[in-house]
Amino acid sequence: MLYLASRSLCRRQLLQRLDIPFQVIDLEIPEVRREDELPQDYVRRVAQEKAQVGLARVGDAFAPKVLGADTEVVLDGRVFGKPVDLAEAATMLAALSGRTHQVMTAVSLVAAGGVAAQVLVVSEVSFALLSQGQIARYVDSGEPMGKAGAYAIQGRGECFVSRLVGSYSGVMGLPLQQTAQLLATFEES
């Protein structure tokens, strides 16, 4: 049985596209970057922790596999997680305005017996120049809350994107091609 260790509705919807039966484990993992931890190491660690905590929660019944993922926006080495309030969301969007940033999504798959696999997908996203009015209207919509980097590419935030190189679904929170490949490889081993 496959489990998705995530509170993200978007990740649930994306995983459904793979037409693989799964159940959701709703858990909360502290997402705190360690001092001097590289952004890619941070997203890998958090994704792995989500999967491992999820596996511990379901136990060994029915040979479970648990999928965990984490997504962060990175600009000039600075990690933009989920904004804590509307003011921080506006600050993040102003920083991203007219710039190219990276969106890093790590996906970890673990199973009983310590078997594990992981993939990291890095996409480059360029934003158009945003006016203060555009930022204010978007922040007022509430959409930035709960989103890494304070935007949802699958929502109104897509209007800000002038260029994307990489995985659209990865920017959303679960890179489908790489996740499908990870699951297939895991089944073969």
Swiss-Prot record:
Highest taxon in the source lineage:
Bacteria
Cross-referenced Gene3D superfamilies, in alphabetical order? 3.90.950.10
The record's Pfam families line, in alphabetical order, gives: Maf (PF02545)
Q: List, separated by semicolons, the cofactors it needs.
A: a divalent metal cation
CC per GO annotation: cytoplasm
Kindly state which keywords UniProt assigns to this record, in alphabetical order. Cytoplasm, Hydrolase, Nucleotide metabolism
Q: Which InterPro entries match?
A: ITPase-like_fam, Maf-like
The record's subcellular location field reads: Cytoplasm
SUPFAM superfamilies attached here? Answer: ITPase-like
Can you state which reaction this protein catalyses?
A: a ribonucleoside 5'-triphosphate + H2O = a ribonucleoside 5'-phosphate + diphosphate + H(+); a 2'-deoxyribonucleoside 5'-triphosphate + H2O = a 2'-deoxyribonucleoside 5'-phosphate + diphosphate + H(+)
Major location (coarse): cytoplasm
The active site of this protein is located at 70 (proton acceptor)
- Which GO terms label this protein's molecular function in UniProt? nucleoside triphosphate diphosphatase activity
- One annotated GO biological process: nucleotide metabolic process
What Enzyme Commission number(s) appear in the record?
3.6.1.9
- CDD domains recorded: Maf (cd00555)
Question: What family is it from?
Answer: Belongs to the Maf family.
Task: Briefly state the protein's biological role.
Answer: Nucleoside triphosphate pyrophosphatase. May have a dual role in cell division arrest and in preventing the incorporation of modified nucleotides into cellular nucleic acids.
Q: What is this protein called?
A: Nucleoside triphosphate pyrophosphatase
